[in-house]
Amino acid sequence: LVTMLIQTELGLKSRTTAEQIKKYPLGKVESLFHLRLENGAMQFFTESIDPRYYGHVVLLAPGEMLKIEEDIPMERILEVRREAKRKVFVRNAVRALRQVAPEHELRNIPNVVLVGGSAEDFEIPEMLMQALAEYRIVCGRGNIRGTEGPRNAVATGLLLSYIGNSQEG
């Protein structure tokens, strides 16, 4: 859903580009030796950046830069990406927590642990922390079994439940 919102709002031809915008931070190559990151910081390089990226907004994927072909300002991409994630993840998380909260009151929840792929996103945990801070809810990422990070929470829970039930029966 986030990918679709990004693609539609930015008028992107490629769904893959929208998916990458959702996953990776942005930068703008301002010279052959530096780029401006989406948070305003500058990142400098000792080796020159490929000249094909000069003047373009890029996605900072692990180990590579991905050029965004469309001529869209970095600020606009950032605004659309954050708003899409807020609409989908934050709104749904608050709604779901309200349903399970004692007396349907969020202030009755002391803490929340984020698990799954969304907990590994570079923006979503921070957005949720900001939204839940309003209700004085402490928010953090889970580390499943102390080794898995936030991934495999449901599968691990189901497996442990199955093992526990089979030992009882």
Describe each PLM feature range.
Residues 2-8, 12, 27-169:
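Helical "lid/coupling" subdomains associated with nucleotide-phosphate turnover
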Residues 10-16, 21:
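Conserved phosphoryl-transfer catalytic core
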